[in-house]
């Protein structure tokens, strides 16, 4: 779950302290005692790249919609009352930054800024350089600790007391930073590069799957298809729709397509820019963040099947609105497809799991509000 700080300035103060304490403290008390000058310079270079990437992640605006933006006909028309303009696809209004953010990923407390289309490469490079620097330091500290342990029978004056104290303090602290940032970095790669999604869009995908498993999504998708593509309401498609609702139980991936996901390399080029600029501190993503290319599955073809029409719906395919719950007293009907058999069971409603999009939360306890989104503007 995203961290919420009582005093927002701590979001900058804590990382600044950790970078300074671990980085410069390790250099002064440990590395300067035995490491060669070229290796010390390399370490300081990595440390400087952390500072530069961090500064850019903090100070770079995550991206705001173009003035007088008009949405194309193939996306939902979402009007932001606070900005008094339409929101481009994948955009959300941040309640902290008080602006609509292009391809909003989340509001980061550690940068006091949103992570969005324009500064996502800076944020990812910031994480990358932390991992590189702490990994190098971890290896150096491990070798140094092993060396001191081998010489433990020597008199104490052979080693500086300050080095031993700092090794004791900084080694576990550095390992903790390395572990946590690596997990965050891998999550970013998994969401954005592997699946082409922001954290909010991954959350939305979980929400849609929850709606699908509870039997409340299919009807909404069919209704949206009739509304957006009225010409697709043929006799055969109506028959297929009835079968989906009463007999045939399609898989989730047969009805829901994330339109902005391509292969891994294309996703990386889209969000990080050309490959030769991935490590360049000022590298920017491809495009303007107001319009995004879509995969072939999302292309609408009038003569296609009902499933193809549903897959071509704009994101999110339910329009961001939750369909009516099929309630029977105080319970909820859930339908699942296991091993080719349709299972129907009655479940007691779970607080928050069958709520509207603005109040729904995932298995991590994350709601739309936790990502910094102004839910009143959704």
Swiss-Prot record:
Give Gene Ontology CC terms: endoplasmic reticulum; endoplasmic reticulum membrane; Golgi apparatus
UniProt family annotation: Belongs to the DHHC palmitoyltransferase family. PFA4 subfamily.
Q: Which GO terms describe its molecular function?
A: palmitoyltransferase activity; protein-cysteine S-palmitoyltransferase activity
Which intervals lie on the Lumenal side per UniProt?
31-40, 141-164
Q: What EC number(s) has UniProt assigned to this enzyme?
A: 2.3.1.225
User: According to its UniProt record, how is this protein modified after translation?
Assistant: Autopalmitoylated.
> InterPro entries given for it?
Palmitoyltrfase_DHHC, PFA4, PFA4/ZDH16/20/ERF2-like
The organism is: Saccharomyces cerevisiae (strain ATCC 204508 / S288c)
Q: Where in the cell is it found?
A: Endoplasmic reticulum membrane
UniProt topological domain (Cytoplasmic) ranges? 1-9, 62-119, 186-378
Catalyzed reactions: L-cysteinyl-[protein] + hexadecanoyl-CoA = S-hexadecanoyl-L-cysteinyl-[protein] + CoA
Q: Where is the active site?
A: 108 (s-palmitoyl cysteine intermediate)
| Domain statement | The DHHC domain is required for palmitoyltransferase activity.
Gene name of the record: PFA4
Its job: Mediates the reversible addition of palmitate to target proteins, thereby regulating their membrane association and biological function. Palmitoylates several amino acid permeases. Palmitoylates chitin synthase CHS3, which is required for its proper export from the ER. Can palmitoylate RAS2 in vitro.
Asked if Membrane is a keyword of the record, the answer is yes
- Cited Pfam families: DHHC
State the protein's name.
Palmitoyltransferase PFA4
